[in-house]
Amino acid sequence: MLGALSALAKTTWDVIVVGGGNAALCAAIEAAEAGARVLLLEGAPRAYRGGNSRHTRNFRCMHQGPMSVLTGTYDEDEYFRDLMLVTKGQTDKHLARMTIRASESCLPWMERHGVKFQPSLSGTLSLSRTNAFFLGGGKALLNAYYNTASDLGVTIVYEAKVTDVLLAGNTCRAVRVFMDRQEVEIAGKAVVLASGGFESDIDWLARAWGPAARNFLIRGTPYNRGEVLKVMLDAGAQSIGDPTQCHCVAIDGRAPKYDGGIVTRIDCVPFSVVLNKHGERFYNEGEDLWPKRYAIWGRLVAAQPDQIAYAIIDSKSIDLFMPSIFPPVKADTIAELAEMLGIPAESAERTIAQFNAACRPGNFHPTELDGLATKGLEPPKTNWARPIDTPPFYGYPLRPGVTFTYLGLKVDETARVSGPGGPYANIWAAGEIMAGSILGQGYLAGFGMTIGTVFGRIAGREAAAHVN
């Protein structure tokens, strides 16, 4: 290993890519195809390579007509409206529209580089017009990209933790890497930072969120601790985004602290009544279609006492959503279910009785906004409001599940990172480490992959062009 380390350190690479997920691989592939000599440094072991991309399912894509597995049309303006709705306008509109437009050419590019897509999934994640789902999920996408990168001659090193970005003025001269129990400096003519956010650093989360963050679960990789982001911010790089903003969904409270992935997400919320630990409802469970609302529920649960809540359904709804990896808690009565979940039984019974009394007759359509709403209830439920009255009853404990954070590095449309006195000469960024440039708050299903793919490709091309 010492010989390999020495060889890495003695080589001045054309492009060094820091990170090993979707954005990093897109950058490495584009740079290598442009003729650059590329080194990719992945901090995780090979078995855990890929950051949060290991857990992804789909890619949101603009298209003017049917394309590959996508149906119908999803044009720039509709895509942009969807983004504005979830971000409440907290976005760089120029970069957002640029990303949306660029997404159209990404899907065929992905297919050319080995990514395969599947027909759209059924149930609440049916997004055949807007999102293309990966056949085999995120790991299959990563395997395809790693194979492509290797075939192109990219040098890939695992368990290579970048601890510093060494600057001379506005230029990066090298990165400091901890590997094989020692630190080495590796020089590069251009650097792409694609190492993710800081969501796995609980202390950093707690500085932003307060003590409540200690109860959060990190459904993404445990390797995204924000070291590269921190050294860049400490060096004066311009930041973008709010440290309290993140992609945070409601996941099963029984999930592990780290790396539970997308299979821990609870998708029954639109068909449920959600109670806090006191047995009280606190938000409209049927506000909108689930793909447009699932990403707000982590923050909603985070605001509840002890950062926990409980989704309760009855037997009418058990087959309407994609199940979590954990089976629901099951009981024949609401009181029994409440006791099993740890909710005051009397309060839970009262809340659900009030909800049931507020439900009105009408046509129920689980895959579209059906207007089946409660009357005289606060908070209301404005769609899919059916009485919870048919045993057996089922419950899931909910916790905030953080996927990635939005505080990041400010970039321009060429993915170049902004320093204290203007753009750095040879530093680009892609993926979660710069996603706050576009995602000021909220989330749109599949859009993180869009940002990573678009800006990864741009960063790789620009870095290679700088060298050439």
Please give the residue ranges for each predicted region:
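Conserved N-terminal/central alpha/beta ligand/cofactor-binding core
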Residues: 37, 43-155, 159, 272-281, ...
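Beta1/beta-strand and adjacent pyrophosphate-binding region of the FAD-binding site
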Residues: 8-23, 39
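An anion/pyrophosphate-binding glycine-rich loop and adjacent beta-alpha core
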Residues: 225, 229-349
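Extreme N-terminal leader/targeting segments of oxidoreductases
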Residues: 1-15, 33, 438, 442, ...
